[in-house]
Amino acid sequence: MRLSAFAPAKVNLFLHVGGPDGEGYHPISSLMVFADVGDRVNLQPADAPAFETSGPFGDQIPAGGDNLVVRAGQAFHRRLGGPVPPYRLILEKHLPIAAGLGGGSSDAGAALKLLRDALAPALSDDDLEALAASLGADGAACLRARALIAEGRGERLSPAPRLPELNAVLVNPGAPSPTGAVYRAYDAGVHPDGAAMPPMPDHLESAEEAAAWLAFATRNDLEAPAVRLEPHIGEVLDVLRGEPESLLVRMSGSGATCFALCASDIEAEGLAERLETMRPDWWVRRCRLS
């Protein structure tokens, strides 16, 4: 049996962050959506267990126990509690590393879905979500891979308001933005607004309305510290904010990927093509968010 699953990029339309609690964790509130660009995870029968990487960023990720796909397999085996037939997991890595796109968590979620399909189809969604949550703060959200609100440490999930079609351009400057370093830089400041959720509309009718509400009521609290650590992020933000197609420009997660919401797919396509010509050293992808 050969199986394949898509692992979509996660985008934080907003990310509000509070100060660390007694255990060092930061409370958050975030509206997460998922793109139609991402990685792919494949599962194949094998003579012995194996994990391989491919794709344009495959050589930049660890192949051992630090990889979330490997850890997902280990967690799945512990949950089954018995021997499993050998298999090979192949990660096609198309998303940049340390990019604020939840790539590792999304890859792990795709791997868990494949392993359930192949080895334990009776395993419940709740069981699978518990495994995903054990792998990281956004593990459960990336397993669901649909628009949602995340609160607490990222484990309290609820449905997002009804969103319009959102066309966007993702841009990464080719510089990693390690999450731990960004949070430490964030902790060095004062943050009176904390992780409070903004009043949420029941629905947003258009991309223009969504962008206006996001700009007025929300923010990404990690954007400023990430820019201080990696000025190339600021360069991307400045370029995107100067383009006529950009309705809203913001960094996703802890960076370094930034996004511009556009009014239509045609406008997103035009912006992406122009950026690819202007800055061939940047990773640029047009996408739809949902």
UniProtKB/Swiss-Prot annotation:
EC number from the UniProt entry: 2.7.1.148
Name this polypeptide is given: 4-diphosphocytidyl-2-C-methyl-D-erythritol kinase
Assigned keywords, A-Z: ATP-binding, Isoprene biosynthesis, Kinase, Nucleotide-binding, Transferase
Coiled coil (UniProt feature): none
Organism: Caulobacter vibrioides (strain NA1000 / CB15N)
Family: Belongs to the GHMP kinase family. IspE subfamily.
InterPro entries listed in its UniProt record: GHMP_kinase_C_dom (IPR013750), GHMP_kinase_C_sf (IPR036554), GHMP_kinase_N_dom (IPR006204), IspE (IPR004424), Ribosomal_Su5_D2-typ_SF (IPR020568), Ribsml_uS5_D2-typ_fold_subgr (IPR014721)
UniProt catalytic activity: 4-CDP-2-C-methyl-D-erythritol + ATP = 4-CDP-2-C-methyl-D-erythritol 2-phosphate + ADP + H(+)
GO MF term set: 4-(cytidine 5'-diphospho)-2-C-methyl-D-erythritol kinase activity; ATP binding
HAMAP family recorded: IspE
Broad class of enzyme this protein falls into: transferase
Active site: K10, D138
PANTHER family: 4-DIPHOSPHOCYTIDYL-2-C-METHYL-D-ERYTHRITOL KINASE, CHLOROPLASTIC (PTHR43527:SF2)
Function: Catalyzes the phosphorylation of the position 2 hydroxy group of 4-diphosphocytidyl-2C-methyl-D-erythritol.
Associated pathway: Isoprenoid biosynthesis; isopentenyl diphosphate biosynthesis via DXP pathway; isopentenyl diphosphate from 1-deoxy-D-xylulose 5-phosphate: step 3/6
GO BP terms: isopentenyl diphosphate biosynthetic process, methylerythritol 4-phosphate pathway; terpenoid biosynthetic process
Binding positions (ATP): P96, I97, A98, A99, G100, L101, G102, G103, G104, S105, S106
